[in-house]
Amino acid sequence: MNIGIVMKKYRKIFIMLFTLLAISLTAAASWMEKPAVRDIGDKIQFYAFDVGQGDSFLFILPNNETILIDAGPEEAGRKLVRELKRLDVKKIDLLVATHPHSDHIGGMSRVLSNFPVGKVWDSGFIHGSPYQKNFYSAIQKKNIPFGRPKRGHSENMGKVLIEVLAPARLIRGTKRDANNNCLVLNITYGSTSFLMLADMEREERSTIGPLPGAAVLKASHHGSSNGTDMSLLKEVRPSLIILSYGRNNSYGYPHLEVVGAVSAIGAIRLDTKDGTFRIVSDGEKLMWPKEREAGKNGG
């Protein structure tokens, strides 16, 4: 018997078996990394995406319908689409453009080209930017139902209530009119509310009146002091506050006044600059990644 030939034969078999094992382990790891999005029971899931300096948030409702609020800047579009597909999102039932700034709608074209969309809500503020024109063109081309809801409008998606708090009317003559005409939403499941302030500033806030209490607050305008302050935080009394901003951004977000106010009221702060995270609620209790609380791990 030629020992060399036998050893060569077994070496080939070993390489084949090792390759198959590696493929199997890779597939298993890929499967395990993917959250069991559709199998968590009667709960609402909220994802705050890390899109750099911008906003993008996903709700997966107990009935498996989805709400995507904003899509971040254009350069984050591919990453956002990958994240949505990783979460096994097949359709966006409600796509919300809170206002036409590029850090909120820059990624919309990629979303619209990768997912069917049930309907679109828009703030109604005409900015005239190429991003907004492309967004409107894609909606029209796909013949997607389109609305510009105002304060007082509400809809139910299964057991979830979506309330429009603003805009109440068109606001002109401010430093940032687009921000002061944002779609501001309160999304409620059971006794848990998510107050989504977009980039609302003081002028728009004055049209709303007292803000509702909410367990989760998406702080206005990336943690800018012209959107979130102590009086607002005392009105809302959130347990969790989300600050959506990019690492080392040129605007200095979040402003120190906001960071101090959040700390003073004792709320837990979660920042998107540290990466995408998920909050889950059964309508009463909130679950969030404790390790992501600001102040931990150098955050």
Residue ranges of predicted features:
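Non-globular, low-confidence helical/coil segments that flank catalytic cores
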Residues: 2-299
